[in-house]
């Protein structure tokens, strides 16, 4: 990575504004999954050990520029204290005199968590005044929030113009793993693209068709491709306006010598419910009033074989409606194949795929689970991420 990291700056005795991604799922004021907090620990611990005064900033949810009591970061501060085994001071604002006062009382190795940065309208507008107010709190800026790197916000991009700006360890790892996958992949290189809609994955498919040896399609978006081949898809998800695009993708794959894999059989249901009547049918035999909600057993075997023969697999998007157990087998089969393929480096592209490997208890068996759904998607589209671009070059 050609960006400076925390290793390249002397942080001893310095105030370090570290943007992290603590946007964790909450229910009734309690954190239901602390993966994102844990992911930032190596950088936080390093800064503490090096004698920095660590000032952490994050967003939580979508308060839209105003204070929402349920989205305060108090529960996050408590959980972080437990994980670090050290008290974390939490402020009620993210900048201003009270915050400066709290920072002035910090010793080397202390940790302070600012209030939710999205309580301020200037954050998402990337307001230079807010960015300057954040910068006034510190001597050095560290961005370890890969999950927010595709956003040009005051705490992810704006502040980097006013302070020395470097990457944290998580940011560094994400860019290195995803960067290598796109620029110098081990082969055979397979991409598995699922999820509900073609329109969300157009950029990824376009970019990856130039790089992969195998492209596997699943999830709701597959049925637009099935329709493009001239098959009837019953009541399955269809994006009518994307049929021609689907055709062009398949033609491009052929031109480039990319093996394009689509479902050969599917699990269909008579309604969208976990207790619906279901059956397995061949891809060209979907009944007119049924809908396909998962890939079938033959497809699972086919996809497993491709995965097992690959050296690198990037997976983004589930194979079916995995939230319902009746339609989770396809997604589970892909996750299991990745877990079993010991010679295959697996990169899970955040979002639903990450949630799926967690759900099936296979997260530990994956080589890299990206912490950023949207960010990893944009990275795989070949886009520059504003939060990364803003950091100092080596």
Swiss-Prot record:
Sequence positions bearing Phosphothreonine: 299
Top-rank lineage group of the source organism: Bacteria
Keywords: ATP-binding, Cytoplasm, Glycolysis, Kinase, Nucleotide-binding, Phosphoprotein, Transferase
Top EC group: transferase
Subcellular location: Cytoplasm
One of the GO BP terms on file: glycolytic process
Annotated GO CC locations: cytosol
Binding residues for substrate: 21-23, 36, 59-62, 118, 151
Keyword Nucleotide-binding belongs to the record: yes
Reaction(s) catalysed by this chain's protein: (2R)-3-phosphoglycerate + ATP = (2R)-3-phospho-glyceroyl phosphate + ADP
Residues with Phosphoserine modification: 183
GO molecular function term, any single one: phosphoglycerate kinase activity
Enzyme Commission no: 2.7.2.3
Recorded metabolic or biological pathway in which this protein acts: Carbohydrate degradation; glycolysis; pyruvate from D-glyceraldehyde 3-phosphate: step 2/5
Annotated binding of ATP, by residue: 201, 323, 350-353
Family under the similarity heading: Belongs to the phosphoglycerate kinase family.
Subunit structure: Monomer.
Protein name: Phosphoglycerate kinase
Higher taxonomy: Bacteria, Bacillati, Bacillota, Bacilli, Bacillales
